[in-house]
Each structure stands twice: as structure tokens, then as C-alpha cells.
Amino acid sequence: MKTAQEFRAGQVANINGAPWVIQKAEFNKSGRNAAVVKMKLKNLLTGAGTETVFKADDKLEPIILDRKEVTYSYFADPLYVFMDSEFNQYEIEKDDLEGVLTFIEDGMTDICEAVFYNDKVISVELPTTIVRQIAYTEPAVRGDTSGKVMKTARLNNGAELQVSAFCEIGDSIEIDTRTGEYKSRVKA
């Protein structure tokens, strides 16, 4: 058991029998009151978020989640199937892939990380950057080049994002999966 003040952002704690990831932890000690830790939490099973305040010396149980490298295999409605290097298959529901679905596409070779809790996959994490191909975008407007000019592009899997004006259909682009934003064009 660890005290609440020992937890940092990114760590996982067992709170009321469920795994909660700490997204933000702020320690506060005022003059007369006891020290407290204000935490922003996200439930790893339901995806629900909350903010709560713990006394600095409240005891919480840390959880260490298992992780395994996997690759996307196929979609069997409503399950996405991932496979590890030993050909074990892991099924995960569409709802548990919030934020990741935008970048999943058939034939992708990116190495992902499956996160396990009690021997069950609860989420999949993509690498921080991935490369995807532009399926469609409007041509750039000549002369409209003051500042950082962006336009909408559609990827092969149907996802849309803002890219630089010089990007064209068929270009490969690098995307930051944490923010979902375009980073750069990849040289062929």
C-alpha cells in the first residue's frame, strides 16, 4: 500500500475494487488543514472519469498492469482482434478502443501494446507516432501561403485530419497518436 501523496500521473491504483489511472495529481498543504491530494482519475474498465480528493496519508493499493506487444489482425463485428508474436489472439470490443479506432486500418503493421487487467485485455495503446497514407484531399490553393496553411485530408481508413497545404493524395504522413494531429510528411 502507498499513501495518496506517493502516486504520480500515469500510475494505476485500485480504488473501490476497480483500476483507476491517475491522470493528474496535485498535492496541497494549507496552513490549518491537513495535506490533501486532488486527483483526476479515469476508470480503466468503464472509461469514466472523475476528480476526487484524498487525504495525503490515505492508503491506496497500486496496480501494475501487464503489457504485451500485439499487432492488429482483423475486425469481427463488434470485436477487434489483435495477435501477439506467439500467435495468441486477443479480442477487444469497439467501446474499449476509444481514441485508437481512428488509426486502425486493415493491413497495418504498427506494433501496439495490449494492456491486461486480471488476464483480460482492457485497452490497446498505439505507438506515439504512426505513418498513414492520404486517400483524398483537395488541391492546394495557389497564393494562399501566409502562415501555416492547413487543409482537410482523408486517410485510407476514412479518418479525417488537418494536414499542411503541400500534402497530396498518396502522400504518407506521420501522425501523433496522443493528439491525433499531423506531424510531418514522410519522404518516400
From Swiss-Prot:
InterPro entries given in the database record: Elong-fact-P_C (IPR015365), NA-bd_OB-fold (IPR012340), Rib_uL2_dom2 (IPR014722), Transl_elong_fac_P/YeiP (IPR020599), Transl_elong_KOW-like (IPR013185), Transl_elong_P/YeiP_cen (IPR001059), Transl_elongation_fac_P (IPR011768), Translation_prot_SH3-like_sf (IPR008991)
Effect of residue 29 to A: Slightly decreased binding to EarP
Positions glycosylated per UniProt: 32
SMART domains membership: EFP (SM01185), Elong-fact-P_C (SM00841)
Entry PTM: Glycosylated ar Arg-32 by EarP: arginine rhamnosylation is required for EF-P function and rescue of polyproline stalled ribosomes.
Subcellular location: Cytoplasm
Keywords: Cytoplasm, Elongation factor, Glycoprotein, Protein biosynthesis
Annotated effect of mutating residue 32 to A: Abolished arginine rhamnosylation
Listed GO CC annotations: cytoplasm
GO molecular function: translation elongation factor activity
Pathway in which the depicted protein is active: Protein biosynthesis; polypeptide chain elongation
Effect ascribed to mutating residue 55 to A: Strongly decreased binding to EarP
Gene Ontology terms describing biological process: peptide biosynthetic process
Classification via HAMAP family: EF_P (MF_00141)
Entry-linked PANTHER family: ELONGATION FACTOR P, ELONGATION FACTOR P (EF-P) FAMILY PROTEIN
Function according to Swiss-Prot or TrEMBL: Involved in peptide bond synthesis. Stimulates efficient translation and peptide-bond synthesis on native or reconstituted 70S ribosomes in vitro. Probably functions indirectly by altering the affinity of the ribosome for aminoacyl-tRNA, thus increasing their reactivity as acceptors for peptidyl transferase.
Homology family: Belongs to the elongation factor P family.
Name under which the protein is recorded: Elongation factor P
Organism from which the protein derives: Pseudomonas aeruginosa (strain ATCC 15692 / DSM 22644 / CIP 104116 / JCM 14847 / LMG 12228 / 1C / PRS 101 / PAO1)
Originating gene: efp
